[in-house]
Amino acid sequence: MQVQCNEKAFKGGFIINSQIATAPPKTLDTTITIGKPTVEDGAAMWELVNKSTLDTNSPYKYIMMCEYFAETCVVAKENERLVGFVTAFIPPEHQDVIFVWQIGVDSSQRGKGLASKLLQELISRDICSNVNYVEATVTPSNKASQALFQKLAREYNTQCEVSECFSEDLFPGDDHEAELTFRIGPLHP
């Protein structure tokens, strides 16, 4: 199912799954389509990551996520051009958790609330009906992602717990920071 989001038509709000949310940080000037990815989106996801400071994975990772995890991944397109995505999965050992692997937003859409909208779309899907926690790993220097997950906790009026996940000495080379786990929830009382 594709959802059309046209913020100007809703006086600063946006539609996700037919629900109106209010007060995004900035208004988008165009229509953004939010939905499930197809394998054809994998290459565009990889290209978006390569234009950013995100950890680069192989193109295969993005194509594979689109093929086998489309229910837990989200893409945003402007005039058929990919401008944002979330890759995520439900860990087999923790069916009440959605683990967000990566969020990418094109520079043309940063600061407009698109990452929040993508997360809201993900959480609202039927596959997440038993999910009570959102988890992600974030480096200490990634203040934007930290703020995004703290905002998500505020939106759900719940906790955002931060703990060490992977220390920097686990990563090969000298250029990878530690990864902190951000755990948001419970989402439902």
UniProtKB/Swiss-Prot annotation:
Q: Which UniProt keywords apply?
A: Acyltransferase, Transferase
Q: Please indicate which superkingdom the organism of origin belongs to.
A: Bacteria
EC class of the enzyme, as a word: transferase
Q: Which residues form the N-acetyltransferase domain?
A: 32-183
Question: Which Gene Ontology molecular function entries are recorded, alphabetically?
Answer: diaminobutyrate acetyltransferase activity
Task: Please give the biological process terms from Gene Ontology that the record holds.
Answer: ectoine biosynthetic process
Q: What is its EC number?
A: 2.3.1.178
Protein's recorded name: L-2,4-diaminobutyric acid acetyltransferase
